[in-house]
């Protein structure tokens, strides 16, 4: 997952833009608006350090969350991953505070 995040950060700016949005409009090939894709990432917009992320939830894996954070240093990022959680957003908030020293 960290390798995937690195690829997105450094080589896929269009994907980073999409995973940073709370919602993204979806258009048909002919340009007609179809609907808004809604993110399930409750932490988007909660901190200026959160650039984007990916959520996941299955019976087998439980709640999963990957977040990409920007630090105060140029070109320095933190990738936090929570796997198999019953409270992925709460656990991620705690991890983010520790990682950022806040």
Language-model-derived ranges and their functions:
Residues 2-102:
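Penicillin-recognizing serine hydrolase domain
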């Amino acid at each position: 997952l960290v390798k995937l995040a690195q690829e997105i950060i450094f080589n896929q700016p269009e994907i980073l833009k999409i995973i940073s949005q709370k919602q993204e409009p979806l258009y048909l090939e002919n340009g007609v608006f179809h609907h808004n894709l809604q993110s399930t990432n409750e932490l988007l917009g909660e901190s200026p350090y959160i650039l984007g992320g990916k959520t996941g939830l299955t019976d087998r894996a439980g709640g999963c969350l990957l977040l990409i954070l920007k630090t105060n240093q140029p070109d320095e990022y933190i990738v936090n991953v929570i796997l198999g959680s019953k409270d992925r957003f709460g656990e991620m908030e705690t991890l983010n505070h520790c990682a950022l020293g806040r």
